[in-house]
UniProtKB/Swiss-Prot annotation:
This protein's record includes keyword Cytoplasm: yes
SUPFAM superfamilies: Carbon-nitrogen hydrolase (SSF56317)
Disulfide bond sites: none
Single GO molecular function: 2-oxoglutaramate amidase activity
Function: Has omega-amidase activity. The role of omega-amidase is to remove potentially toxic intermediates by converting 2-oxoglutaramate and 2-oxosuccinamate to biologically useful 2-oxoglutarate and oxaloacetate, respectively.
UniProt keyword annotation of Lyase present: no
Domain CN hydrolase: residue ranges: 4-248
Modified residues (N6-acetyllysine): K68
Assembly notes: Homodimer.
Identification of the protein by name: Omega-amidase NIT2
Localization in the cell: Cytoplasm
Signal peptide feature range: none
UniProt-listed Enzyme Commission number(s): 3.5.1.3
Amino acid sequence: MATFRLALIQLQVSSIKSENLTRACGLIREASKQGAQIVSLPECFNSPYGTKYFPDYAEKIPGDSTQKLSEVAKECSMYVIGGSIPEKDAGKLYNTCAVFGPDGTLLVKHRKLHLFDIDVPGKITFQESETLSPGDSFSLFDTPYCRVGLGICYDIRFAELAQIYAQRGCQLLVYPGAFNLTTGPAHWELLQRGRAVDNQVYVATASPARDEKASYVAWGHSTVVNPWGEVLAKAGTEETIVYADIDLKKLAEIRQQIPIFSQKRSDLYEVEAKKS
């Protein structure tokens, strides 16, 4: 299939987990009605974003939140990229994205590889490592449309991850993410366009909607970028669904016109995965 429809759900996340789950599933159903074949929720879709919240909202996978995603994926017969939730496993907490196929099967589980530990004086200090542990594996899955690579938020800053996904045949990279009012205006779109052009792939980011009263205010602006670096669709800050038709013929044309993969100087440099 040369073209398929992608939907990004920019969810307004509250402190009430059950409400977040109900609204998320309702918006997934709405995206399905609009013809979406792959849908992504935002980072931390069932919980406020913050290290003080992660322990209280954490679940095992499978668990209540992921069970509901499995059920709605099967009901709508679509691929559901479950944003991320705080996951607890073997005494540790992770920021984890679970992906479900059209039959409700868990296809892959991506644990955020790069923890968001930053300090921008006078603006924002945040230490995910206060409560979270990093993942240690690459995460990709196949659909009838294309191969999809996964990252979560801060993972997008590390170009090597996107390069490895491109090497492994991914044509779409999806990053559920929650940039903030400092990093968002500076880098959110820039990073997406950079990853898309460098690797000649589609890049999509799904953010929570902005809540000015939250302890961590998300940037919003869920976005889809094509391999030419053009923004195909972009949300504002409110709760909404963003749609984009992903044209793989366009991707093939760009790779033919500017054949960077065959022109790489592997005699001089390489990016190598140290784990499978």
